[in-house]
Amino acid sequence: MARRGQQPPPQQQQAPPTQKNQAGKFNPAEFVKPGLTEEEVLEIKEAFDLFDTDGTQSIDPKELKAAMTSLGFEAKNQTIYQMISDLDTDGSGQIDFAEFLKLMTARISERDSKADIQKVFNLFDSERAGVITLKDLRKVAKELGETMDDSELQEMIDRADSDGDAQVTFEDFYNIMTKKTFA
């Protein structure tokens, strides 16, 4: 309490509500978008805070490398500096939470997409040999009730097979599945 004739202590200013709401708490709802839940935003914020070791509400290249590595992503120096260059909209040389969220959302969706494609590949690779063969395609076509002759199935393999060994590796399969147009 202020004594008579004394001014009360000045109120501390709060950070603008870009990452915190009026009560000073982080509001994940501000960052939710299609394909990203509040829970995922909070998990990414926890990672951001964990690696914002100096508490500046931004992550520098050294902190970003540690964050990406801990989340299971490859983090070469050249990649890190390229990420910062691509995402650093304010030219600070660092990434704030909104920029970090954009990066992680892209990486998560890339990782999830690859995992989903791996599951589909495994459905075709019935012998778990790490490749899809004519025999595998024949079996899947039969299970799906498709009537395709071996020449049609072989043509499918030939289109996807990058090294001409008459087998489709996961890499071949992934490339076909993520291709925007088919020749």
From Swiss-Prot:
Keywords: Calcium, Cytoplasm, Cytoskeleton, Metal-binding, Repeat. Residues 39-74, 75-110, 112-147, 148-183 form the EF-hand domain. Ca(2+) 2 binds at residues 88, 90, 92, 94, 99. The keyword Cell cycle does not apply. Residues 1-30 are annotated as: Disordered. It is found in: Cytoplasm, Cytoskeleton. Ca(2+) 1 binds at residues 52, 54, 56, 58, 63. Pfam families: EF-hand_7. One of its GO terms (cellular component) is cytoskeleton. InterPro entries: CALM/Myosin/TropC-like, EF-hand-dom_pair, EF_Hand_1_Ca_BS, EF_hand_dom. GO terms for molecular function: calcium ion binding. Gene3D superfamilies: EF-hand (1.10.238.10). Belongs to the centrin family. Monomer. Plays a fundamental role in microtubule organizing center structure and function. Component of the infraciliary lattice (ICL) and the ciliary basal bodies. This is Caltractin ICL1c. It comes from Paramecium tetraurelia.
